[in-house]
Amino acid sequence: MAVFRAFKALRPTEGKAAAVAALPYDVVNREEAAAIGKENPDSFLHVDRAEMDLPAETDLYDAKVYQKAKENLHKMEETGVLVQDNKPCYYIYELVRKGKVQTGIAGCASIDDYLNNVVKKHELTRSDKELDRINHVDVCDANTGPIYLACRYTDALSALLEQWKKEHKAAYDFTEEDEITHRVWVIDGDEAISQIQGEMEKIPALYIADGHHRAASAVKVGLKRRQENPDYTGEEAFNYFLSVVFPYDQLTILAYNRVVRDLNGQSVEDVLEKIKENFDMTIVPGFPAKPVEKHCFGMYLDGFWYLLKAKSELYEGKDVVGQLDSQILQDVVLGPVLGIGDPRTDKRIKFVGGSHKLRELQTLADETRGVAFALYPTSMEDLMQIADESKLMPPKSTWFEPKLRSGIFVHKLRG
């Protein structure tokens, strides 16, 4: 059963939440982060992308970057932009996108639950990305970005959160330029905290929706702290990592599309003929071909959009991973036809997440005379089944929207 405990969040003072809240560090590039930081001195990107406050030639993984992140975090606390609560609390975090509401609870998951697979994963991580966040967490002495978790809520837990919302005023309520509304309620009542903790203990598993690298890094820092503190009790803050848990059926997964920069030395005609071996192909004149069901793909190649429907032998009788559209595409097109052996490391492939328009795929493909593929979104049910079976998805199979903002909650590793 899941351990999910209250904590003393370091969080924006009243009136500062909208200015502080920032997209996750890995959603914005260096130039975008620098532009945001230049306009907004309170943006949490000064912590999560601290290279913006160093000379432009500074390497992203230089020790100076992590030290600057630590300095910037301390400065935000010293100047009163961030203030720590004086007792452990839970926090309701509600996001509204295009009229759809998702309501989660912020707290701290256990590194032991991660190690024992109560916190379930569905993706591999890259060691270089892990090391970056390990250094960031360790030097800052804090989890600065929440892990996006999902689970099957109990009815009582949902009722507790709704009741608290009705009876209390939100601490934060702001809408950002992307028209996503963020609301936070602080649950500081002892009885409510105890009830929520009890309900969380009834939940058998938590699923990482987004944030595999942040989670793995937080756990490794926790294990490092245990080695440094052999008399640890398990109650120390470093035994836990910052998370927000949502009901799985409230989450939205968008498509994660692919663009390959060339045709692997082949002609357009050769590529089309090879793809026809495994797909029923229909040309779609004049506009992007958006897949409307599982096992359908949109493809843009040489000025034309095509709708591809996988032949049944590609997925019938396969396990849940083998039936994923991202796996089918890798197994019969990206690998054997286009030569993308390892999509994690091959620089010829670009992944384009969720909210980007299909016209952008077309533009990217045209720039290098490559090919683009639009996928149908993976379902939460497939994600959870894969995690339950301890299997792994291909990289970049899921794109969650809306993204949780960093800076709304910080979990200090020394309490």
Give the label of every model feature segment:
Residues 1-415:
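Surface-exposed, charge/polar-rich loops and edge strands
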